[in-house]
Swiss-Prot record:
Cellular component annotations (GO), alphabetically ordered: cytosol
HAMAP family per the UniProt record, alphabetical: RibA
GO BP term, example: riboflavin biosynthetic process
Keywords: GTP-binding, Hydrolase, Metal-binding, Nucleotide-binding, Riboflavin biosynthesis, Zinc
Protein name as it appears in the record: GTP cyclohydrolase-2
UniProt-listed NCBIfam families: PRK00393.1, ribA
Cross-referenced InterPro entries: GTP_cyclohydro_II, RibA, RibA-like_sf
Pathway(s) per entry: Cofactor biosynthesis; riboflavin biosynthesis; 5-amino-6-(D-ribitylamino)uracil from GTP: step 1/4
Matches recorded under Pfam families: GTP_cyclohydro2
Source organism per UniProt: Vibrio vulnificus (strain CMCP6)
Domain of life: Bacteria
Reaction equations catalysed: GTP + 4 H2O = 2,5-diamino-6-hydroxy-4-(5-phosphoribosylamino)-pyrimidine + formate + 2 phosphate + 3 H(+)
Length: 198
């Protein structure tokens, strides 16, 4: 059974001015070092906390890549939760689970005209290899059974529900369209059935 390993205060956001806590876990399904970032002690102060499962994206989260909207979604969520409280489950699932180097290979194929899903398939991967079991385990370790989920992705909604987490409300993120990511976002809508207006 998963449990909280450590819980430490820190400040986050573009200006490091938003109070939060970072939590590590033990007993998760794999040895991936997933973390939770909690704002305003939402795990104890909110009966049904706002939760976002955010899969690691080095290129978007750290380098603000033009190819995706991951960094903007993360920043939007941090700012929202900094004001109203909530929990980010930061999952080490780079490239929808294919890993960083394979994602870079997929970028090369996208530059040649494939969309994000076609590129993954061409490399021998399914559309999305992520498994959200550990996100459910993290919520269980925090004693959370009901959430308001911040997502545009129906797979996240479906899988968390299958793992016994009751999703009381779905809160969509904004569409963060910029030069270089419009075809990526359109593929997420047409192929991945994401709830986005692009």
């Amino acid at each position: 059974m998963a449990e909280v390993r450590a819980r430490v205060d820190f400040k986050v956001g573009a200006k490091s001015n938003i109070d939060a806590e970072i939590l590590s876990f033990r007993g998760l399904k794999t040895d991936k070092e997933h973390v939770a970032v909690i704002f305003k002690s939402a795990d104890v102060t909110q009966e049904v906390p706002l939760v976002r499962m955010h899969s690691e994206c080095l290129t978007g989260d750290v380098f603000h890549s033009s190819r995706c909207d991951c960094g903007e979604q993360l920043e939007e969520t941090i700012n929202r939760m900094g004001e109203s409280g909530g929990i980010i489950l930061y999952l080490r699932q780079e490239g929808r689970g294919i890993g960083l180097y394979n994602k870079i290979d997929a970028y090369r194929l996208q530059s040649e005209g494939m969309n994000t899903y076609e590129a993954n398939n061409h490399l021998g991967f399914d559309d999305d290899l992520r498994d959200f079991t550990e996100a459910a385990q993290m919520l269980e370790a925090l004693g959370i059974k009901q959430i308001r989920l911040v997502t545009n992705n129906p797979k996240k909604i479906r899988e968390l529900s299958e793992y016994g987490i009751e999703i009381v409300e779905v809160v969509n993120t904004s569409a963060h369209i910029k030069e270089g990511n419009e075809s990526y976002l359109k593929a997420k809508v047409s192929h991945g059935k994401h709830h986005l207006k692009v």
